Each structure stands twice: as structure tokens, then as C-alpha cells.
């Protein structure tokens, strides 16, 4: 891992936020080893508050990304418009938690697309979750996907968290997978990335920030086994592009020799064994060989 983006619940203004203060300390301590980015995740109604412009200025001062939780029923054209205008005014990229529901009537993503195109927004837009898109009727879904592509929006699908949470009802087996329609999105030219989202918290009590695990579960849930090499970019180059990290996420001539070498004979072998040994390379030098058991031992010591 050479870069990581996290979402900070921003209830207070960033300069008074314990989350932002702690993040700044960690970002400084790790700056020579990791690129850390923070998204200020706020409820969408915050755009109507008098302090929103001040919040955006503080986010920009910290090289942060403007985020918003766009849940069912919260999105209105006026709110989305204010969000985009504030982002443009302060030179902020957007990272949006949008339509995390299997309700096909959710319209947050469609409002984001329409607003981005109308404003000709110059910043980078990331749309995370987008679960409702998979439940829309095919003509409506295809039209919206075309709009996403035209607006240049990056889509981040969360196979672990969304597979765990979506269509969840007590005493009932889920019928729906909750995964955004990643195959259709990629076919339309949209940059698709996979990510872990929650790790060992109330929303997803498992995981350990392992992108191989994310890739494996995306292959299973999305039935992507036909092109594992092609979809691997959704766990490296795709996220790098969504984060604005030019040239990162790929091995190329003249680039940094950062990679992970797995003890596997092929894709099937890699996805079949959860304890595959790996060698982490940074700047062409191995940091060591780890097995899943060794990682677990180190975590328990910590």
C-alpha cells in the first residue's frame, strides 16, 4: 500500500474536529511512507448551514476532499447545486456517499450527474456505493451510466460492506447482492474501483484492509472470473486515478518499483487460498515475506 483515502465524520468544523486533528498528526508521521487523503464526510443538509463555506475553506486548507452523505430522501436539486458551487468556489474535489440502498427509486446519483454536467464541474468526482443503480430498470440504468461516463465520475464499489449490509432483514436470507453494476459501468468507459470501506466496525465487523481480500470478494460477488487480470486494475490503477495520483498503481518504466509478489501459480490459485505468502516491495527492495498467520500474530501483539 502506497496510498490510502479515508472518510472522516466531520460533525464539527475541521479545525475543531478530533478526527481531523488526529488525522493530521498521522498524515505527518507517515508522509514519507504513505500518501494519506481525507474526505470530510458530512450530511448533505450541512450545505444549508451558515458555517458551510467556512468548513469548505478549512477542508481546502488541509488539502482535503469535500464529501457528503447523500442518503434516500436527502437529495434535492437545491442541495446538490449548493454542494457543487461550494466545491468549485474552494477548488475542492468531491467524494460522495450516494444511493447506498437497494431502493430503485433513489435519485441521489442522477442528481449528481445532472448537476456535474450542468456546471461543467472541473474537479474530480468520486461516487461511492451506487447500490441502487443495480436495481433500476435497464433503460433507466443505461441512461444514467452513460451520464456517469460523460461527467467523468469515478465509481467506487464496496463488495464487502455492501454485500454484508444490503437487503438485510432479521430472520430472512438476502435476495439482492447490493453491488453496483460494475460490468456495465466499465463497459461504458467509467473508471471503476473497489475498496474495503468499513473495517472491523459496526457496519462491517470483519476485514483487515487487505486489497487482495477485496479483489477476491469482488470477483465472487460480481461474477468477474472471465477477466481477472483486467479487473485487477480496479484495485490499483483505478483507485489511483480516482485519488488523482498520476502514474501510481501500475508497474511501468521509470516508475517506482512498488509491488506485492504473491506465492501463487495463477489467478485461481491466488483467489483460492487465503493464507498466500506475499513479499512486499518498496522502491525495488523487499520488506519481508508474510503469511496470513504472521500478520495475525503481529495484530494481536499490537
Predicted regions and their residues:
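C-terminal cap of metal-dependent C-N hydrolases
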Residues: 241, 253-302
Amino acid at each position: 500500500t502506497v496510498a490510502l483515502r479515508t472518510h472522516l465524520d466531520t460533525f464539527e468544523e475541521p479545525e475543531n474536529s478530533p478526527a481531523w486533528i488526529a488525522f493530521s498528526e498521522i498524515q505527518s508521521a507517515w508522509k514519507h511512507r504513505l500518501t494519506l487523503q481525507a474526505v470530510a464526510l458530512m450530511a448533505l443538509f450541512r450545505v444549508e448551514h451558515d458555517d458551510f463555506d467556512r468548513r469548505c475553506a478549512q477542508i481546502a486548507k488541509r488539502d482535503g476532499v469535500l464529501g457528503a452523505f447523500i442518503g434516500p430522501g436527502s437529495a434535492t436539486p437545491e442541495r446538490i447545486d449548493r454542494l457543487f458551487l461550494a466545491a468549485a468556489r474552494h477548488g475542492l474535489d468531491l467524494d460522495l456517499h450516494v444511493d447506498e440502498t437497494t431502493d430503485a427509486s433513489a435519485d441521489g446519483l442522477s442528481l449528481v450527474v445532472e448537476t456535474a454536467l450542468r456546471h461543467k464541474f472541473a474537479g474530480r468526482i468520486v461516487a461511492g456505493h451506487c447500490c441502487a443503480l443495480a436495481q433500476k430498470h435497464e433503460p433507466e440504468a443505461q441512461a444514467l451510466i452513460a451520464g456517469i461516463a460523460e461527467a467523468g465520475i469515478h465509481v467506487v464499489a464496496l463488495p464487502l460492506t455492501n454485500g454484508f449490509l444490503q437487503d438485510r432483514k432479521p430472520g430472512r436470507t438476502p435476495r439482492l447482492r447490493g453491488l453496483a453494476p460494475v460490468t456495465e459501468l466499465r463497459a461504458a468507459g467509467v473508471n471503476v474501483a473497489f475498496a474495503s470501506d468499513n473495517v472491523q466496525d459496526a457496519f462491517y465487523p470483519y476485514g483487515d484492509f487487505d486489497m487482495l481480500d477485496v479483489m477476491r470478494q469482488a470477483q465472487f460477488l460480481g461474477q468477474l472470473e472471465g477477466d481477472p487480470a483486467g479487473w485487477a486494475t480496479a484495485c490499483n490503477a483505478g483507485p489511483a486515478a480516482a485519488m488523482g495520483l498520476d502514474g501510481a498503481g501500475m508497474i511501468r518504466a521509470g516508475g517506482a518499483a512498488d509491488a506485492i509478489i504473491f506465492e501463487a501459480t495463477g489467478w485461481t490459485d491466488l483467489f483460492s487460498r487465503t493464507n498466500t505468502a506475499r513479499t512486499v516491495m518498496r522502491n525495488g527492495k523487499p520488506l519481508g515475506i508474510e503469511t496470513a498467520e504472521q500478520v495475525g500474530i503481529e495484530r494481536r501483539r499490537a
